[in-house]
Amino acid sequence: MLEIDWTTEEPALAAGQLLVVPLREGHDPEVISARFGTAVRDAVAKAPFLGKPGESFGFTREQGGAMQHVLLMGTAGLADPAALRQLAHDAAREAQRLGASELLLDLHGADGLPADGDDPLRTGSLLAQGLELGTYVYDRFLSEGNRRTPSLRSATAWGRSAAPADGTARGQIVAAAVAKARDLGNGPPALVTPTYLANTAAEIVDTLRSEGHDVALTVLDREQCQEKGMGCFLGVAQGSDEPPKFIHLAYRPKTAGAGKPTRVVLIGKGITFDSGGYSLKPTDGMLDMKLDMCGAAAVIAAFEAAVRMQVQYEVHSLVAAAENLVSGGAYKLGDVLTASNGKTVEINNTDAEGRLTLADAMVYAASTIHPELMIDFATLTGACIIALGPRIAGVMTNDEPLYADWTAAAARSGEEMWRLPLPGNLKEQLKSKVADMRNTGERYGGAITAGLFLSEFTQGVRWMHVDIAGPAMASKPWGITTPGGTGVPVATILELLAGDIKTTAS
């Protein structure tokens, strides 16, 4: 973790530093001249560096006997949380590339900062998130000679006003949770099994208990899940020799905020490897399926962070963890599975397995926890990526106030969400001749019919479904993400839990 400081006075220069100065398009060239001299101003103009987002201009200078790297970075303004976090992220990345041990981020001349308004805590959080995630790398399986020792140790932000330490600490908690979710997603499937997820949850609980938090863990094995009638979840799991695990993390705050929902349930899809079953995926479609548990990674990581942030909700994270494989014992096309609420489901696609595991988790949440609201997160459908592209999550809900709170949290976090409808007429696609319903609809509207399927298992609880099939994973760097697991939507979950969730159901 970086040592992050804020100051309103210009920091002293030292060797091994990187100074980053954000500039907007249309900036006055004389600003550069006054700060760095006419030679730098002329070189910037010749480059040309205009100050557009994504542009940068770097040089080295000697001052007071110390060599200092300087990077001018273009920005459209820093009031937008995504832009502010991106600036910090890119600055930290460049510091790592240059081998700098200290980063100086000059926000003194930057306009549009939230800190210039009434939310310096948010500014501190966003900057800390960007700085920490700018140092993220998944190198666990690189040999020693191919690993790069991180150089960056500290960062100082110089601004017109200082953000409080609380904001910085909160941002570092959020960043650590995003990084943990990425690590879980990026781990190979032979390592990150259902048992591994359960053990990770146990380690988190042990650590949090040692810090004095009221947390608990329940892990149900196959036999215990059978006793609870989780036929859909166990049907998916039966093709693998790896035992399934149903994970229930619980946190109870010391004090409850007045007028807030008492219990919030976060449910994450936990398919640690998805071959598609007998509806077998092609190789290209299977390569990234170690990441089919990114929903589980998000709710496990967000749980730990929410406890450390001491949110005022009783938070429960649920994961029905399993592998979806092909074997002589795997579930088959035409099978009929019985969910724990008694609904029967005809299987017409074994690659639509995530909704089956979520269904039993939702029934468990409603019947065992009795929450005020529950939200599921799942890399559920390719159809959602086709509809919204790879960077936007699809949201479906039965509750307007909950959706309003969620989208506000997403806007604060800088993660992108878009609502999809739940039209009743499309439920016709889920009708079965031999069971209460089938697990997939027709070709069109696949993301929506998946949401409609899940809506049959809400048991009257306020509910929202977030399809993260696109933004949970990245094939190449974009924004603050690296290839692999992205950690989306951890930041939005934590923004939601840190705020006031409306208690009025629609």
How should each PLM-predicted stretch be described?
Residues 197-506:
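A generic structural signal for tightly packed, nonpolar segments enriched in small/aliphatic residues
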